[in-house]
Amino acid sequence: VADMVAAEKIQLIVWGKDTIPNCKELFIPMQHEGGLVAGAFEEDGEMIGLVFGFPCSEQGVMHSQLVATLKEWRSQGIGTQLKWYQREWCLDHGYQKMRWTVDPLRAANAELNIRKLGGTCRTYYENYYGPMQGIDAGAPSDRLLLEWDMTSARVNGRAQGTPADVGFPQAGAANQVTDGVPTQSRLDLSDAQILIHIPDDFIGLAAGDAQLANRWRLHTRE
């Protein structure tokens, strides 16, 4: 139970005190009914990272609701390790696929979920959660649905250390940005690979300029 309370607290630290965290009264039955709540811990027992998922209605599919790492522990691969642990646990318990939603304007999401983990996205949801609080406030909550085929050659390769793609120099640019402001879109591209420019730090942008954050959201949604 103490770990579940710690899991509540880490959400408030990561997403902001104004958010409504998943509570221990949810975590505990989810854990008993086929879900997974797992943490990363410091040597003194402090929880520094968290991952949480639950079974989907579709057989053999897990939905991963969140992964979080305390700010002072980021850029050390902890979130990546939690996802690989989640994959191992899921495969051991009969799950072959995992899904979760990601903010398409957060560069760190693409780095972890697509490049490092080998996930793919085919579905775009507009304002998926409605208005949000904390670090997610300031713009509509558009999300990509990320699909993780945990037994695919792509994902197995990432798990075994195959280097992720490092760039697409021949890709066409779908939008233009001037001084941090999106200006033009090209919706007629037929290139096999297309690049979309996004902010380096959308969370910081939304905290400082909600109007510009909203402009970015509507621009990339288009």
Region annotations inferred by a language model:
Residues 93-95, 112, 122-222:
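Intrinsically disordered, low-complexity, positively biased terminal segments
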Residues 86, 110:
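Aromatic/hydrophobic pocket-lining residues that form π-stacking "cages" and hydrophobic walls in ligand
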Residues 90-103:
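Conserved GNAT acetyl-CoA-binding A-motif
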Residues 118-119:
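Conserved Class I S-adenosyl-L-methionine
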Residues 1-71, 103, 125:
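A conserved beta-strand-loop-helix scaffold within acyl/acetyltransferase catalytic domains
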Residues 73, 77-85:
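Conserved acetyl-CoA pyrophosphate-binding loop and the N-cap/start of the following alpha-helix
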